[in-house]
Amino acid sequence: MATNNLSILFVASEVEGLIKSGGLADVAKALPEALQNLQQDVRITIPAYTSIERLADAEVVLETNLTSWPHTKYRVLLLTLGNNPVYLIDCDPYFNRPSMYAENNQAYTDNGERFAFFSAACLDMLPKLAFQPDIIHANDWHTGLVPFLLKHRYGNDPFFAHTKSVISIHNAVFKGVFSYDDVQCLPEFHCRNVPDAAVSATHITMLKAGVMNADKINAVSPTYAEELKTELGSHGMAWEFQQRAGDLVGILNGCDYSAWNPETDIYLPMNYSADKQSMVLGKNTCKRALQQRLNLAEKDVAMFGMVCRLTQQKGVHYLLPALADFLKHDVQVVVVGTGDPVLAAQLEEVAAQFSDKFVFVEAYDNELAHLVEAGSDFFLMPSEFEPCGLNQIYSMAYGTLPIVRGVGGLKDSVNDYDVDPCDATGFVFYEPTSQALLLTMLRALLLYAQNLTEVQRVQLHAMQKDFCWRKAAESYLQLYRSALN
């Protein structure tokens, strides 16, 4: 085991650059990359989904068997992503499907077996590949059985004698709850009495298995780590997180500034920097382009943007009742996103009623998302809960002031103007109501109307904040070393 440079296996269900459905994929690419830049040996493992375009280029490095499964044969394929090797666990019956997790909004009925197999194969392959990691870093429920199996199956295996496990909690809402029948391929569950994984007499939760067996646990922001110890924040796992409180830390995710940088962003009509003249000209140009794209009047009014999944978590249900009052003012608002059809229909109604001020774009449009970040003056994130959040960090990089609810990573990353104007980077409210959101939007609008110069000062200050992945990676290294000690 190296004292300074560690060998790390980063296990996830998806990784940006190969396959992505959400923010976990961004972390799975950026964190290993940042750790590699700190001279660590980091290798990523994901399933070999057939929808990965680069799969045909992969090298076969192992063909082997995993006993006691209906489908025992699997291969390990090798690709590189940047400077990181990526091992792909290839087993057609489990991963040769049109999607990763679900089809037609219906989760695959054998997801428990699929990701139990993946977790078991991740550990099974290591001695066969002669890769002996110091740390195995699991992520969310999909890989929750990795720390469990490391302890229960390989606890006395000399190959793993010095290997420790860490699990990251990106969103505790999703726990991976399955019946014992779903995971009967694992002998460890044959007795149907596994307290450190059980959620009832008949079901286990893979996330609990990870939390109760990992050497260290991290949440993706310090505030979220505290929230996980409450019933509301943990969505039913408060006891488990309280039991492991001494091993639970919060590390705020970093930002991939190579993809989100107004100085180099290829989607903007004009790039700009954190220089006042450059920022004012650049943001005004982007606002005009955004207004043209949305068929809104090209005028100097405050622009409020929101890009999100249309779910209750993102606080769209707080925004909707606030819009009728807010849109009486001289403002423009754009919401971009897909998701809940009921929320989408309600947003369409507002757009029909206030067509000169409010636009709803029901789409996932990356180019438009970049333009909204640059062309807006304020960015709305009234989340019900937000483990980390990234859009508030992107917004600050683009000189767009986030309006956030003070939960999770939003609380950790945004400084409220009313609390400390000098160090402000946005506006924060706490009460989970439409009225609290409305009052905060009006606070921002009033400052814009009365003192645009002050708004621009705060925007420039926000642009100078640094949430780079290197800082986060250094914190993860400390966490890994504490696990090893």
Curated annotation (Swiss-Prot):
| Classification via Pfam families | Glyco_transf_5 (PF08323), Glycos_transf_1 (PF00534)
Which UniProt key words apply to this protein? Glycogen biosynthesis, Glycosyltransferase, Transferase
| Broad EC category | transferase
What GO terms fall under cellular component here? Answer: cytosol
Metabolic or biological pathway = Glycan biosynthesis; glycogen biosynthesis
Question: Catalyzes what?
Answer: [(1->4)-alpha-D-glucosyl](n) + ADP-alpha-D-glucose = [(1->4)-alpha-D-glucosyl](n+1) + ADP + H(+)
Q: Name one GO molecular function term.
A: alpha-1,4-glucan glucosyltransferase (UDP-glucose donor) activity
CDD domains given in the database record: GT5_Glycogen_synthase_DULL1-like
**Coiled-coil intervals, chain numbering:** none
Where is ADP-alpha-D-glucose bound in this sequence? K20
Q: Which GO terms describe its biological process?
A: glycogen biosynthetic process
Q: What is its EC number?
A: 2.4.1.21
UniProt xrefs under Gene3D superfamilies: Glycogen Phosphorylase B
The free-text function statement in the UniProt record for this protein reads:
Synthesizes alpha-1,4-glucan chains using ADP-glucose.
The entry sums up its family as follows: Belongs to the glycosyltransferase 1 family. Bacterial/plant glycogen synthase subfamily.
Q: What is this protein called?
A: Glycogen synthase
